């Protein structure tokens, strides 16, 4: 099973992709995670990606396409995978389709997690991270001590691309470049719209029901 998760920044794609990965035993491939790992390690890819991500812009196709094409050919992807954060444009979707065609495979379903803009801004601008990997939110998941991680006791920080002004720019970029991909998968007859406004557990149930109805 090969799935693509679509939706605006903050729609919960990463959370749901992780659950799908666990439930169906297929790898979760997140271009965002790949970029952040490289930024943290100070690699050349990380330096290139950071220039764009800090401004709320998409990393250029030539960088992203190569990473994904290489990743999906790895052994753990033989039974399928779930893509989160890619493809983001019609051009990327066409590159993915061609790469899969060469492997004798296709995208089975594209899940579009739909969340209103105001909820996206609230979700992202209130999110705080810890370098140990834990995530908190000033409204939905407050730490026991303000500004301190419950797990490791270190100071929390806000990602540059989660600051309110950058979130708004990310949404503009999404509508300019990424939203048209919804029509791309709709035209192929494999788009499934998911209400992303409930709590994550409820969204997971909606996705499970949709995949079951689609025969997965």
Which residues fall in each region the model found?
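Glycine-rich phosphate-binding loop of ATP-dependent small-molecule kinases
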Residues: 1-216
């Amino acid at each position: 099973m090969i799935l693509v998760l679509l939706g605006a920044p903050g729609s919960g794609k990463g959370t749901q992709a992780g659950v799908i990965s666990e439930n169906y035993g297929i790898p979760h491939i997140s271009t965002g995670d790949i970029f952040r790992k490289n930024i943290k390690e100070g690699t050349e890819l990380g330096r290139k990606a950071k220039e764009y991500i800090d401004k709320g812009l998409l990393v250029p196709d030539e960088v992203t396409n190569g990473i994904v094409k290489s990743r999906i050919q790895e052994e753990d992807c033989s039974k399928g995978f779930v893509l989160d954060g890619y493809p983001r444009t019609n051009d990327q979707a066409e590159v993915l389709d061609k790469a899969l065609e060469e492997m004798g495979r296709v995208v089975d379903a594209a899940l579009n997690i739909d969340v209103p803009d105001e909820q996206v801004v609230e979700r992202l601008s209130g999110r705080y991270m810890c370098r140990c990997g834990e995530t908190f939110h000033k409204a939905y998941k407050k730490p026991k001590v303000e500004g301190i991680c419950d797990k490791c006791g270190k100071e929390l920080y806000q990602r540059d691309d989660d600051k309110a002004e950058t979130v708004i720019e990310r949404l503009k970029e999404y509508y300019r470049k990424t939203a048209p991909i919804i029509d791309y998968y709709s035209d192929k007859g494999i788009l499934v719209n998911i209400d992303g406004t409930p709590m994550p557990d409820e969204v997971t149930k909606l996705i499970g029901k949709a995949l079951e109805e689609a025969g997965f």
